[in-house]
Amino acid sequence: MTNSNEAQENALSPERQAERDEVLAKAKKAKEVSSQLLLNTQQKNDLLADAADALEANAADIIAANEKDIATGKERGFADSLLDRLALDTERISGIAGGLRQVIGLSDPVGEIVRGHTRPNGLRMKQVRVPLGVMGMVYEARPNVTVDAFGLAIKSGNVPLLRGSKSARHTNEKLVQILQDVAESHNLPRELVQLLPCDTHDSVQDLITARGLVDLVIPRGGAGLINAVVLGATVPTIETGTGNCHFYIDSSADIEEATKLVINGKTRRCSVCNATEVVLLDSALPDPDKIYVLQELQKAGVTLHGEKKQLDPLINDVVQAEETDWTDEYLSFDIAVAIVDGVEEAVAHINRYGTSHTEGIAARDYKTTSYFEQYVDAAAVSINTSTAWTDGEMFGFGAEIGISTQKLHARGPMGLPELTSTKWVINGEGQVRP
């Protein structure tokens, strides 16, 4: 009886079972398509070019679908910032289409020889880039990710399996329908790109545990989403981590330049992962220089958080910092400020509280910048420049699927090469191993 009762308790509702069945069926179909997908570079580029044209040609339909999501978002009380990320208009759709055209211009990584050599016995060995296979994407209310993921997956030879946000349901459905129509017009299966159900969070769990069907899952969104995917997955994941980015101003820095860099990193776009969230001031800086940095931040509309006993002698209107001020992203016009005793204490602070995204330093002393570069734990280190540069396009990689903050497989902005694996090919002339 116990086993019977447990089975009843663990049984899925009909709705939940249908959702799970749909996710697994789509994953199986994606796996079939990926194993048969052999597109050369020209075929990939032609597909992407037609997809870009189709998005612009169907802009009115996309906007109509998007308006449904915006209306629902307003009813649900979404913040203006979320509604802005969700909204599409003709200009934004053209920008998304332009992103696909940019991918066309990128070098196709598939087939690239990473390295090779000939052994003394005449065996010729080479390591060649190959697609990963089925690439799952879990993301929040950014419909542009639907198209970006499609473009990067196709160019790198992968098949995207997309699990977007419920808040962008109608927009994503329309975008994927257009992309599927284009695939069909190229005599390719519509399952070249698929959208998973988004009614419950359980569909995410179905995707990230579909080991053997899905080769990789990449989460893009807030810390809660990323942690849920990374910690709950049995499928390999790449953590596109949050960006609690720091900027250390050394006593050797040009103070006006350093201040400009901090303000750019904080205020250019405060809601992005490469925004500066913490500024660390060298205690050896003269007080007038410290005051100058803090006053300029306030003039730029930034609220200062920190230890009041440390900062009150320098400036007014400081908000007393809590532990979360050091650990969390603000994503707003707020910045945490601490005074540290030199670069070693700055690095120790960063390595304790940072998220391994981007860390910056302003200094003219070579030993100081060298120490920072060597010992700070980060995917990107900005020396005498803004943290805002950590971006695939700015790195010259073209489009990116996210910025990886983990150390295995990929780290930093992920472009096409990071969406591939490799295989070794050994050519011989009948050699047998003794």
Curated annotation (Swiss-Prot):
Residues 16-25 have a biased composition (Basic and acidic residues). It comes from the Bacteria. Keywords: Amino-acid biosynthesis, Cytoplasm, NADP, Oxidoreductase, Proline biosynthesis. Its main location: cytoplasm. The keyword rRNA processing does not apply. Residues 1-26 are annotated as: Disordered. Pfam families: Aldedh. Its EC number is 1.2.1.41. PANTHER family: DELTA-1-PYRROLINE-5-CARBOXYLATE SYNTHASE, GLUTAMATE SEMIALDEHYDE DEHYDROGENASE. Catalyzes the NADPH-dependent reduction of L-glutamate 5-phosphate into L-glutamate 5-semialdehyde and phosphate. The product spontaneously undergoes cyclization to form 1-pyrroline-5-carboxylate. Belongs to the gamma-glutamyl phosphate reductase family. This is Gamma-glutamyl phosphate reductase. The gene is proA.
